[in-house]
């Protein structure tokens, strides 16, 4: 099982990955902090997944961009906002490449 979500759904996916037995989490537009309040970081939620996590955020996301960490890969799409809507195929390609590289998954 690979679970994921966008924005607050990405937070839920990270917080519930352990309970669901997810092999990995895809976190699109993870809201690192409320806009203008970097002191209210939610970075700890990413590590709650306790599995591989891919975060795809836009370079212009007002919710911030998390740092890479062990088991947490961060892809930043240039010019994208929190919506990730300018070039969705770029986010799809990044997610597909990451999924293809995860050991233990069955690929069609």
List each model region and its residues:
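Short beta-strand/loop motif that positions the catalytic acidic residue
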Residues: 48-50, 55-57, 61
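Catalytic histidine-centered segment of alpha/beta-hydrolase-like enzymes
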Residues: 80-92
